Amino acid sequence: MLEACLNQLKALGVKDENITVVTVPGALEIPFALYQLYEANDLDSMVAIGCVIRGETYHFELVSNESSRGITDMISAEAISIANCILTVENEEQAKVRVLEKGTDAANVAVEMGNLKVRTDKQLGYWSSEQTDKE
C-alpha cells in the first residue's frame, strides 16, 4: 500500500520534499505518530496506512476500532485531513487483493483534501506568503 500511495502522490505532482514516511510498530500507534507529525510540521493532509488481520481473539475488533477512533478524534480536534487507509481484513489474501487500489485511493483522497485545506485557508486568510511554494 505504501508503494502504491507514494507512486500515486508523485503522479499527482506532490514533491518528494513534501512527503514524509514514518513507520510504527502497530495500528494502535498510528494516531500518536500522526499527532506528532502534525505538531511538528505544517501539513495540508496526511495518510494513515496499515493492515489489521483478524485473528482468533477479540483483539482484532479492539485494534480496528481504537485506531480508527484515534484518527477520527484527531481529524475532529485538529481540523486536519487524514486519509485513513488502515485495512481491516479477514486474511492475508484479502489484504493482497486490496493493497494496490487502497494505497492509490488514499493518495487521491489526501491530495484532494489537502487542496481543499489550502483553498479554504486562503479564503479564511490563514495563508502566508511563505506557503506559496507548496502549491
Where are these predicted regions, by residue range?
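Glycine-rich phosphate/diphosphate-binding loop of Rossmann-like nucleotide-binding domains
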Residues: M1-P25
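Short, well-ordered amphipathic alpha-helical segments that serve as non-catalytic structural scaffolds
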Residues: M1-Q8, I30-Q36, G70-I71, A106
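Structural motif
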Residues: T20, D44-M46, I80-I86
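Short, ordered loop/turn segments at secondary-structure junctions
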Residues: V24, G50-V52, I86-E90
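Glycine-rich phosphate-binding loop
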Residues: E29-G70
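C-terminal binding/interaction regions
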Residues: F60-E61, N65-E135
